[in-house]
Every structure is written in structure tokens, then in C-alpha cells.
Design a protein with these regions (language model features):
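Short, amphipathic alpha-helical interaction segments embedded in low-complexity terminal/linker regions
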Residues: 22, 131, 136-219
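Glycine-rich phosphate-binding loops that contact phosphosugars or nucleotide phosphates
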Residues: 2-128, 136-140
């Protein structure tokens, strides 16, 4: 996206790595990283194919544009179609120029400040991005019930969270969960399968690999 939609896309993509343990989601904003903190006027007017040079038919591209006519986003969607990728457009205008395999129209109406789409339109876009990324990750097996079992244990807070996830998912006490998590190299999903299936972490990892990461199938 460009401007606010681009920042929202980058924000949602950035959260997928720690939450779901995947680097497969990348945010792209017109004007590059500098546009995250500074308005780069004019960046939205043209799309540079180099921004998506590595896009393939195995990918999906989500373009976000409140007006449905931002040149940068329309160019990105066209580039993705040419590459054979799945395309999704999130827009806030009915019948806009944005063309995609899936078009999500959020009819949020006029802004309190006319034209300031960082307000109602941006809020609605973020809600949809949350729902979209979370539902995709659930479908890919990166959650078990309401628990983010692929969480990356990169700090003390997330370590405590991972222990609680293992404890609750496996129905064990905190001491057992802590030991299982340590034995599994900090990987909550592996610890859960090991505890519920009564196997060691190595066998749990093999089961998860066979099940393409889905805890239920691994059990």
C-alpha cells in the first residue's frame, strides 16, 4: 500500500513472525522503509516492479487502497497477476478500479475529516488485515485452538507466554510445561505434541513435519 494503508500492511506483516513463527509475510510500502515514519509525497503515483521482483505464482499479494485507484497499488496488483500470484484488494469504495481475484469492499462512508482516510477507512482496513492474516495462519496449522503455538520465544515475556500455552494446551502444571518447553528447544508446538502423545521431542518434531505443522494431525 501507500501512506496509511501501506503502514498498516507493514504493521500486520511484522507481527506474523513473532506471533506465528513465519517469515513468509512481507509488508511493502510505496517509498520504502523511510515512508513508515515520514510522508513521502508522490511515492504512490508510480509502481516500481523492483519492489516485488521476487514475487512468484506461489505467492499472494494483498493491495490496500481506500480510494481503490492508488496507482502504486493498482500497479502492484497488475504485476502480481502477471506473475501468476493470487491477488486480493482491500478498498473502501464500491465499484473501484482495483481489480483482483478477491476484492474486499469496506463501505465505511465519509470521513469525519473529509479525505483523511487514516481515520475510519484505516481502522476498518486494520480490522480486516487482522482477520485475514489470522485466519490464514489458523488454516496453515499455526494455531491450536485459541493458542498461538508457533510463537517465537525471543524474550522473557514470550517465554512466559509459551510456558502458559504449553501448560494449558497439554493440561499439565507449569513445572512440567517449563521442562517440556526447554526439552523442545523453546518450540511450544513440539512440547505440546510430546506431552499429549507421550513421545520425546525428536519424535514430536517428526510427527509435526509429517503433519505439515498441524498439531491435531500430529496427534
Amino acid at each position: 500500500g501507500a501512506g496509511t494503508p501501506g503502514r498498516l500492511g507493514v504493521l500486520d506483516a511484522a507481527e506474523c513472525a513473532p506471533t506465528f513463527g513465519t517469515d513468509a509475510v512481507r509488508g511493502v510500502i510505496a517509498g520504502g522503509p523511510a515512508a513508515l515514519t515520514t510522508a513521502i509525497e508522490g511515492a504512490e503515483d508510480t509502481f516500481d516492479p523492483a519492489d516485488l521482483a521476487d514475487l512468484t505464482a506461489a505467492d499472494a499479494l494483498v493491495g490496500i487502497t481506500a480510494s481503490g485507484r492508488t496507482p502504486y497499488v493498482l500497479g502492484a496488483l497488475e504485476h502480481a497477476r502477471t506473475a501468476g500470484a493470487l491477488t486480493v484488494a482491500i478498498v473502501n469504495n464500491a465499484g473501484s478500479e482495483a481489480s483482483a481475484d478477491v476484492v474486499i469492499e469496506l463501505l465505511t462512508g465519509p470521513e469525519v475529516l473529509a479525505g483523511s482516510t487514516r481515520l475510519t477507512a484505516g481502522t476498518a482496513q486494520k480490522v480486516v488485515l487482522n482477520a485475514l492474516s489470522t485466519s490464514v495462519m489458523i488454516a496453515l496449522g499455526r494455531a491450536y485452538g485459541p493458542r498461538m503455538v508457533d510463537v517465537r520465544v525471543t524474550n522473557a515475556k514470550l517465554r512466559r507466554r509459551a510456558v502458559r500455552i504449553v501448560r494449558d494446551a497439554a493440561g499439565v502444571d507449569e513445572h512440567t510445561a517449563t521442562a517440556a518447553l526447554a526439552a523442545a528447544g523453546g518450540h511450544a508446538k513440539t512440547a505440546i505434541v510430546a506431552l499429549l502423545a507421550g513421545v520425546d521431542p525428536a519424535e514430536a518434531a517428526v510427527r509435526l513435519d509429517r503433519a505439515r505443522g498441524r498439531v491435531r494431525d500430529a496427534l
